[in-house]
Amino acid sequence: MYQKLLLVPLLLTSALASPHDASSHQKFHQLNERAAFPIPASKGSQTFKEPYYVKGTYDGGMKTFGRGVKCTGQKEGGDKDAVFIVADGGILRNAIIGADQIEGVHCEGSCTIENVWWQEVCEDALTFKGTGTGVHKVIGGGAQGADDKVIQHNSGGSAIIQDFTVQNFGKLYRSCGNCKKQFKRTVQISGVKASNGKTLVGINPNLGDSATIDGCASSVKEICVEYEGTDNNGKEPKKAHSGPSNTCKFKEPLASC
């Protein structure tokens, strides 16, 4: 009887301790993941009252740039909400986009986004706009905390994404699924480091889209998803396929990061 009485408190102590220990371990793991995001140290900050328009080349000197506003989640914004608007042929490099913004960076046509980092993505990090068939390059840099898309491709042409780091995200790249004016789009991704995401790439093969993907991915549910794109802006595109195909080109599985 004495042994049984001793055993009960010990079991109760163990039962009470286990959830706490698991929770602490989970929080510690989450903090470690956040700390691992390799965003460079900021060399200052600047808040814009309106979008900064980039013609030619703009080097941000690794400062943090924002708009001094709170993120509005997945509520659709516009050009007026961007931190930078990059003109056709423009180059934006060496910048950190702060959390105090809504729309991040917009490209009006062909552009190069080099070594640009997003502290926390709001609606989208980077949007390719316009009506042309240009080349959109993303070289280095990274983003985290996107509830949905990191890179939204609305215009036509190609996207080249090299050595980009993305963590805790919905989609790294999405070819617009229901834009009123649709285009054929291609995306080439190499050297990507992706972790804790839902979908790496989403394309619309019925509109001529294709994707080539190489890099590493950890805890990413789907690497490449094919949709039936539409020009009906009020309709969500249907998911058609997930995995390697003639239009989703990658070796399954991708290496773990």
Swiss-Prot record:
Source organism phylogeny: Eukaryota, Fungi, Dikarya, Ascomycota, Pezizomycotina
Keyword set includes Ribosomal protein: no
Similarity field: Belongs to the polysaccharide lyase 3 family.
Cofactor note text: Binds 1 Ca(2+) ion per subunit.
Primary role: Pectinolytic enzyme consist of four classes of enzymes: pectin lyase, polygalacturonase, pectin methylesterase and rhamnogalacturonase. Among pectinolytic enzymes, pectin lyase is the most important in depolymerization of pectin, since it cleaves internal glycosidic bonds of highly methylated pectins. Favors pectate, the anion, over pectin, the methyl ester.
Source organism: Aspergillus oryzae (strain ATCC 42149 / RIB 40)
Pfam families: Pectate_lyase
Highest rank taxon of the organism: Eukaryota
The keyword Cell wall biogenesis/degradation appears for this protein: yes
Molecular function GO terms recorded: pectate lyase activity
Example GO BP: pectin catabolic process
UniProt subcellular location: Secreted
UniProt entry keywords in alphabetical sequence: Calcium, Carbohydrate metabolism, Cell wall biogenesis/degradation, Lyase, Polysaccharide degradation, Secreted, Signal
EC numbers: 4.2.2.2
Enzyme class: lyase
Gene3D superfamilies: Single-stranded right-handed beta-helix, Pectin lyase-like
One cellular component (GO) term of this entry: extracellular region
Signal peptide: 1-17
UniProt protein name: Probable pectate lyase E
Requisite cofactors: Ca(2+)
Reactions catalysed: Eliminative cleavage of (1->4)-alpha-D-galacturonan to give oligosaccharides with 4-deoxy-alpha-D-galact-4-enuronosyl groups at their non-reducing ends
